[in-house]
Structure formats: structure tokens, C-alpha cells
Amino acid sequence: MQSLENHFLIAMPSMQDPFFKRAVTYICEHNEDGAMGLVINQPINITVGELLDKIEIDNDKTQQAAQVSVYAGGPVKTDRGFVLHSPKHGYSASQALSSDIMITTSKDVLASLTTAQAPEQFIITLGYSGWEQGQLEQELLDNSWLIIKADPKIIFDTPVEKRWEKAVSMLGFDISQLSPEAGHA
């Protein structure tokens, strides 16, 4: 199977796992060893400013960025933060995932979020979604997910409550017409 990096996994309406129900997961890494992604539409009850206070990083509460929700990126290592952001170089642990999206895991990006040095657009997730070798491929065969090339507008410009619907609309068909069982139309 080709790499699904820089793609969205869109949870099928029949998804039973409550964590992933109506989830849109951005795939950051996918290779023969497994996959890693961040759910981009599951806000949690903490703002960026509150998170920065909790980890003792100075921040400007008057900035809109301090009021933005943090997201549950997945059930793995929920104490670890990941910042998906528009391209901005200079952070110590950044990787370009596409021409429009970078991921940074270092504290220097967090310190910049409520300043003029912040990336133009960003979301923070706590935790990530991980799949062992062959696990994601099996879930795809089991009809748990739909796949589409990622669109940064869904991550950064679409209101969180509309991200699943917007991703589904990119598929070009009515998802309610799909059979919940693999191999059946």
C-alpha cells in the first residue's frame, strides 16, 4: 500500500470506538512499521493559554491564540503535545509534512504561540493516534475509515464542528448511502 502521509482518515458513520466516532485524523507518518496521526476535530476542555500556564510557559492571555481550544490527538501518550501549523521554520523539532503543513513537538513553538513569532495558523493536540505494522491497513479493509488527501483549509480554516462534514463532502458522494459492511454496496 502506498503511504497515507498527508491524508485524512475519515471515520465511517458506523465507527463504534467512541474516541474515533466522526473523527478526522491527519496522517503524519505511514510506512511499513505502522502509522501515526492526529485527530483534528476532538476539542478538549482546555485552551492554549490554560495549557501554557499548566506547563509554565509565559503567554499573553489577551491574544486570540490563547483562547483557542486544544484537541485530543489520540489515545496514545496523552501527556505529549503536537503542534500542526502553517509553514514557519526555526523551531528545534519541526518537520514539514507537506508544503502547507508542519508538525513541531518542541517547547519553543509553544512559547511563540501568543506572540508575533507564532505560526500564522496552528492547532495543538495532546496525544496521538498510532497503528502498529499492518493495523491501519486491516482497519481500512474492515471498512472503518475512508481516505482522502488532506486539505489544510479543513485543519486551519474550518470550524471544528464542521470538519468531519467538510472532509466527507470532499469525497464527492453521499456517505449515508454506504453500506457499513466491507465488500457490500
Curated annotation (Swiss-Prot):
UniProt superkingdom: Bacteria
Record's protein name: UPF0301 protein PSHAa2600
Similarity section: Belongs to the UPF0301 (AlgH) family.
Organism annotation: Pseudoalteromonas translucida (strain TAC 125)
InterPro entries found in the cross-reference section: AlgH-like
Any one GO cellular component localisation term in the record: cytosol
Family matches, as Pfam families: DUF179
Gene3D superfamilies per the UniProt record, alphabetical: VC0467-like
